[in-house]
Regions:
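Conserved amphipathic alpha-helical "coupling/scaffold" segments
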Residues: 2-164, 168-171, 271-274, 278-292, ...
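Active-site phosphate-binding and catalytic loops of NTP-dependent enzymes
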Residues: 43, 94-100, 122-129, 182-197, ...
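Extended, Lys/Glu-rich alpha-helical coiled-coil stalks
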Residues: 72-80, 104, 258, 265-269, ...
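Extended, charged coiled-coil "arm/hinge" scaffolds of SMC/Rad50-like chromosome-maintenance ATPases
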Residues: 139-155, 241-262
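Extended, Lys/Arg-enriched charged tracts that mediate electrostatic binding to polyanionic substrates
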Residues: 165-215, 284, 312
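Charged, amphipathic alpha-helical linker segments immediately N-terminal to NTP-binding catalytic cores
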Residues: 281, 287-325
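ATPase nucleotide-binding head domains, primarily ABC-like/P-loop NTPase cores
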Residues: 308-552, 557
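Terminal-proximal interaction/regulatory segments of ATP-powered molecular machines
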Residues: 559-592
């Protein structure tokens, strides 16, 4: 029984990650990660959890805006130089292990960088949200100074770390110099017996290269010979005792170095919790900075998120972030903005239009807009976008899972939609549902019936459902239920090309035959297809829709003309006002 329940729960939660994948949210996060400054920052951007409530989303947005403003005001921006990933180092030290000098220096560098960042960012008036994060962060200056005093660049333990270490190293250098002088004397004395005048090393011992057959001329220990046998490497007897003395000194130095590393590691271990908290706060700040820089790159604007479920969706000229990314890297400018204007009482929008017209892009755009706002990112659009905070975003786009499971397209859609319906029950809250080609993949009559029934169910259970479709009957739902609305991807009848613009309140025209003709389908097939349809009925519908489109264009053009006229009027008013004030001031000065 328990196993069955867990399996059912897993199926219901599966749709959450599946929907994110279908909307290509992981790719957006991957793009976000390129604006991070550290490896751990990049990992955070790629795998963060979306906020579970509105206040957390608002917190993230405030952090994004605060650090973005600061970053833009600095010539070289905010730097995270010196910040390191300390997770493994802290684990070693907290368990009583001994960290190497290089790792301990990373701790010191991170503490120094943290104090510098805290000083730069902390301002409870200008940056209250970030300051709240940093308020209780301890940067442990005494520990930083201890480690920096004892360690040189690269993590080498400095001579100054302890008097004993300094004395031992000086003594070792003195003995090494003594041994070198003795070996140089031997080279001068026995130069004729040597292959060269170089002091070499074998197995940690100093040796001289004697010619074969001459090594018995001097007492010593043979450590090696050349491959040809022509050279014998001998450590002269006179320096063997010195070498033994150096080995003992090296051992004492190693013991002292190990003692120092152990002491410092212990100090780090005692402060591991404090340091881990500091590193986590730095990661949150870097995450905020990454969001700010990505948002700036997108020319984004902050969205207003509403707690009220029945608030409007108002997003103007949204540019799909992945298309913006592709355009930038391909040096193009082809992204067509999409606008959404969904009234509070609307529950279902049916988008119709040609396959090549960008219906799926529009579907993904609103899904990504909701996710980006939820994650504290600015939206790549204009104006002041406003939308409800959505707890759930569920999507059925494409049939990737169907292919993986060897299911038909229709079966794949139905299974995913079933998971969406189950998830709405399990995860109550404001929900956005996105359905691509709803009811497709089966008999059109039954598919239409299923699509209509499904959208009516969604109207009762989700805040907003947006569905793309080819079924003409779905366009009629708005006339029997005020919660439904139509939208379409506009189509240029002159060029027989989709414009990729989303039009609200106008259903899409049937352009299948025109598109097929443009794509080069055999002319006889086109002629035969035209005979199978009722031309009068189709022409009437298309003429009505075309008339609506032209009326919309005229209204939009008139609105643009009115806006331009208003702008000119306001400018003229401002100029007249300035002129009047200037004349008045001159008159007052003259009277004085």
């Amino acid at each position: 029984m328990g196993l069955t329940k867990n399996h059912d729960d897993s199926k219901k939660t599966q749709i959450i990650s599946e929907s994110l994948d279908l909307l290509e949210w992981p790719t957006v996060c991957s793009h976000l990660s390129t604006f991070a400054l550290t490896q751990q920052g990049r990992k955070k951007c790629e795998s963060f959890d979306l906020p579970r409530n509105l206040s957390l989303s608002q917190e993230l947005l405030s952090q994004t805006l605060e650090i973005g403003s600061l970053d833009s005001s600095l010539n070289e921006g905010i730097s995270f130089d010196g910040v390191h990933d300390l997770e493994n180092i802290l684990l070693i030290c907290s368990k009583g292990g001994i960290a190497i000098g290089e790792d301990l220096l990373k701790v010191a560098d991170t503490l120094r960088a943290a104090r510098k960042l805290r000083k730069l960012i902390f301002d409870q008036v200008i940056r209250p949200r970030l300051s709240e994060l940093l308020k209780d962060v301890a940067t442990l200056p005494d520990l930083q100074k201890l480690l920096e005093f004892g360690l040189d660049e690269g993590g080498r333990i400095a001579d100054r770390a302890s008097p004993k270490l300094s004395e031992l190293r000086r003594y070792r250098n003195s003995v090494r110099l003594q041994r070198k002088d003795i070996l140089q004397d031997i080279i001068r004395k026995y130069g004729g017996l040597l292959q060269d005048n170089i002091i070499s090393e074998r197995y940690g011992r100093p040796v001289l290269a004697f010619k074969a057959g001459t090594s018995d001329q001097i007492k010593g220990m043979v450590h090696d010979s050349s491959a040809s046998g022509n050279t014998i490497y001998v450590e002269p007897q006179v320096v063997i005792s010195i070498g033994n003395r150096l080995a003992k000194i090296d051992s004492e130095i190693s013991d002292e170095e190990r003692r120092l590393l152990a002491d410092w590691s212990k100090e780090v271990g005692l402060n591991a919790i404090v340091i881990a908290h500091l590193v986590e706060i730095l990661l949150q700040i870097e995450f905020a900075l990454s969001r700010a820089r990505y948002s700036k790159w997108l020319n984004g604007v902050p969205a207003i998120l509403d707690q009220e479920e029945h608030s409007l969706f108002e997003i103007k000229d949204f540019r799909h972030p992945l298309l913006v990314w592709n355009d930038f890297h391909e040096k193009k400018n082809t992204v067509v903005p999409t606008s959404f204007d969904v009234a509070p009482d609307l529950k279902v929008v049916a988008i119709t239009g040609p396959n090549t017209g960008g219906k799926t892009v529009a579907l993904k755009s609103i899904g990504l807009a909701v996710l980006m706002a939820k994650a504290g990112l600015l939206l790549p659009c204009t104006g002041s976008p406003r939308l409800p905070w959505c707890k759930n975003v569920f999507a059925d786009i494409g049939d990737e899972q169907s292919l993986q499971q060897n299911l038909s397209t229709f079966s794949g859609h139905i299974l995913r939609i079933s998971r969406i319906l189950d998830a709405i029950d399990v995860f109550p809250g404001t929900t956005l549902v996105l359905l691509d080609e709803v009811g497709a993949g089966t008999d059109p009559t039954e598919g239409t019936a299923l699509a209509m029934a499904l959208l009516q169910v969604m109207a009762n259970r989700a805040r907003l459902t947006i569905a793309t479709t080819h079924f003409g009957q779905l366009k009629a739902l708005k006339y029997s239920d005020s919660r439904f609305e139509n939208a379409s991807v506009s189509f240029d009848s002159e060029t027989i090309q989709p414009t990729f613009h989303l039009q609200w309140g106008i259903p899409g025209r049937s352009n299948a035959i025109e598109i097929s003709k443009r794509l080069g389908l055999d002319e006889q097939v086109i002629i035969s297809a035209q005979k199978f349809i009722n031309p009068e009925r189709v022409d009437n519908v298309n003429q009505v829709i075309q008339g609506l489109e032209k009326q919309r264009e005229r209204q939009q053009s008139a609105a643009e003309d009115a806006a331009a006229l208003l702008a000119k009027t306001e400018l003229l008013h401002e100029e007249l006002l300035n002129s009047w004030q200037k004349q008045r001031q001159q008159s007052e000065e003259f009277n004085e």
